[in-house]
Amino acid sequence: MAEQTEPAVITPAMLEEEEQLEAAGLEKERKMLEEAQKSWDRESTEIRYRRLQHLLEKSNIYSKFLLTKMEQQQLEEQKKKEKLEKKKRSLKLTEGKSLVDGNGEKPVMKKKRGREDESYNISEVMSKEEILSVAKKHKDNEDESSSTTSLCVEDIQKNKDSNSMIKDRLSQTVRQNSKFFFDPVRKCNGQPVPFQQPKHFTGGVMRWYQVEGMEWLRMLWENGINGILADEMGLGKTVQCIATIALMIQRGVPGPFLVCGPLSTLPNWMAEFKRFTPEIPTLLYHGTREDRRKLVKNIHKRQGTLQIHPVVVTSFEIAMRDQNALQHCYWKYLIVDEGHRIKNMKCRLIRELKRFNADNKLLLTGTPLQNNLSELWSLLNFLLPDVFDDLKSFESWFDITSLSETAEDIIAKEREQNVLHMLHQILTPFLLRRLKSDVALEVPPKREVVVYAPLCNKQEIFYTAIVNRTIANMFGSCEKETVELSPTGRPKRRSRKSINYSELDQFPSELEKLISQIQPEVNRERTVVEGNIPIESEVNLKLRNIMMLLRKCCNHPYMIEYPIDPVTQEFKIDEELVTNSGKFLILDRMLPELKKRGHKVLVFSQMTSMLDILMDYCHLRNFIFSRLDGSMSYSEREKNIYSFNTDPDVFLFLVSTRAGGLGINLTAADTVIIYDSDWNPQSDLQAQDRCHRIGQTKPVVVYRLVTANTIDQKIVERAAAKRKLEKLIIHKNHFKGGQSGLSQSKNFLDAKELMELLKSRDYEREVKGSREKVISDEDLELLLDRSDLIDQMKASRPIKGKTGIFKILENSEDSSAECLF
């Protein structure tokens, strides 16, 4: 009997139907995901709007509170000044009589003591109903955070307008309070003293903008608010802080006070306190552990003629090491110098400093914004954790850190959201920044010129070989190093390789024996690849860092291969030292002419080995020079700095950028040459400010040497992109603390102003030169001319100068120089 075939359970029609249903399901799921994404985007936008509004309102409360307090104080100050005017007129009428004591401070002190007992409360500024309504509003917003109801943009606009109006009045009050008014009795070195200058500040006369900065710090201190003093480097932030501490002592605050900063800045703090406020006791908290244990006891003792606790000056490292001892002190004022050191929220320094008990905190930094917005938020969170408490929200709203965005994209975003205007409004009560251009009468003008140099033939050969990773073949094949493996199969670290320290003996013969044993291994592990022609040249290739090799090639090919004289076996120093480097060709045209015109020059480089080659060039051209780098002792640094500042024959100062960027004064120079640029633009700016600062009497010109179309140019462009962020956030007209600057905060940044900021450059022209003469005499004259800066300094008013960028390009076909304007 034949078997009957049963019909298939799963038919082709069923399979087709299943596929159609699956496709329909996937399509439906895709649409659901799209809708969910859109819904999430809408909700997240609303949440960010609420958070932004909350931040604006909190900033608004601070501003309104400060404004009311300052207006009250302004009335009292006005009455005091009127009394002082009457006293001045009385002194003129009764010249032979003394109505006050020798210092003329009795009426002032009496008035200030009366004011000291007054108490302020936020209820004087905002009614209870207003505060409760704000709190209720935030509670309602949190309850509705999951809803999709749109938040009215007009509410935020209203808050911004309110903030603008309050901050405008606040800035006017700051400027009015610090209006220059000389004391009719007090004098310092025969010069009249500003009325606001504290009586214990006796070592000099404060400048008008320093008085204004002190008034701003006083306003923050009296109202229990922390802040950031971010004046440009070289404007005297230290003096303003010392004056503020002197003012606090005059008001009856006994201390102690704490100044915390990098080790290199401590001598300057101690010297400035001794110079300007000799009566105020200071304590350098440093030394061995035993020394510091003894010094802790002195913090709690009242000292000196004023019988107050000392101003304690210490370094970041000691503050972290002795946190247990220092955290138990109740500091009246904590000053963190070079505050950008705490830009990383996860670093140990910021964690330890947050534990310090301080009534008020102040950050000093000339570079409040270096790389990204989170660094600025880190500083603000350290000072005001209640206001700046959400980094993600802060970054999500002010997301302009994308360095790839074009100027047009940023302008379109600003037109739509006004995020920059909002950020300026929020930062206003807590940040004060003035530039040298704001105090142009005090500091001579400065111009920065970027000079593009070509690659010479040898540089081109090396550069191409480095990019192709064939550079080692040019100096002979190198034996591959045998890699020693650990028991787990991983390469052993060099630091883990065994060393028998018991073999070390005090006898010279044993030491020589040990050296002879380890020398072969040291030679095998050298990262320097020695070529087959050691008699003719010294080759230095660190093959593990290609980018550094490219930078060295741009600086000078001798950093990779330095020729050696076969007879003397010393480095070969001749004209090829100049002709083998595009930057040296530029220097060789500029430096002799600068010397002839009587200028003194600072040359900054990132690499000490580059300074060595520059020294060889100085010997070749018989230039008298000084040098400063991180390997030099303190006494050597002081000797070389003194020699450069006082000896007219010393023409050049060769300085490593990081070692010479902080804490030194080189105002004898009026020309700066940045031989190679830093990835961080603020490092180069700090280097420039060694000579462009208070005390400089001549215009300053900064020449930045850049090798065209190489990694050198990429570094400069990347640094310029970082400065673009600073231009937008720390706007030069929005944080001056005065009416002329901060009153502009009520206006939005228009598209034209943004475009000027984003596209602002230092160049207006290009110069093409032949290889035989990299710069023509005419172009060299244009490059070195600073007559317009001298006219600007004499006129004491801004004059649009000949700012420019000189792009030196090879033109092998046409030897004639062509100027394109």
From Swiss-Prot:
Q: Which residues form a coiled coil?
A: 14-96
Protein's UniProt keywords contain Endoplasmic reticulum: no
Tissue expression per record: Highly expressed in thymus, bone marrow, and testis. Not detected in heart, brain, liver, kidney, skeletal muscle, spleen, peripheral blood lymphocytes, small intestine, colon, prostate or ovary.
Task: Provide one Gene Ontology cellular component.
Answer: nucleus
Q: How is this protein named in the record?
A: Lymphocyte-specific helicase
Question: Residue limits of the Helicase ATP-binding domain?
Answer: 218-386
Q: Which family does it belong to?
A: Belongs to the SNF2/RAD54 helicase family.
Swiss-Prot/TrEMBL induction comment: By concanavalin or lipopolysaccharide in unactivated splenocytes.
Compositionally biased residues, Basic and acidic residues: 103-118
Tell me, what is an example of a GO biological process annotation in this record?
Answer: lymphocyte differentiation
Q: Which PANTHER family match?
A: LYMPHOID-SPECIFIC HELICASE (PTHR47161:SF1)
Which InterPro entries does UniProt cross-reference here? Helicase_ATP-bd, Helicase_C-like, HELLS_N, P-loop_NTPase, SNF2-like_sf, SNF2/RAD54-like_C, SNF2_N
Looking at the keywords, is Transcription present?
Answer: yes
This enzyme's EC code(s): 3.6.4.-
The protein's GO terms of the molecular function aspect are: ATP binding; chromatin binding; helicase activity; hydrolase activity
Supply the alphabetized keyword list. Answer: ATP-binding, Cell cycle, Cell division, Coiled coil, Developmental protein, Helicase, Hydrolase, Mitosis, Nucleotide-binding, Nucleus, Phosphoprotein, Transcription, Transcription regulation
Residue intervals of the Helicase C-terminal domain: 586-736
Top-rank taxon, per record: Eukaryota
> How would you classify this enzyme at the top EC level?
hydrolase
Its biological purpose:
Plays an essential role in normal development and survival. Involved in regulation of the expansion or survival of lymphoid cells. Required for de novo or maintenance DNA methylation. May control silencing of the imprinted CDKN1C gene through DNA methylation. May play a role in formation and organization of heterochromatin, implying a functional role in the regulation of transcription and mitosis.
Q: Please tell me which stretches of this chain the record labels as motif DEAH box.
A: 337-340
Q: Give the main location.
A: nucleus
Q: Where in the cell is it found?
A: Nucleus
Residues reported to bind ATP: D231, E232, M233, G234, L235, G236, K237, T238
Identify the species of origin: Mus musculus
The annotated region (Disordered) lies at 78-120
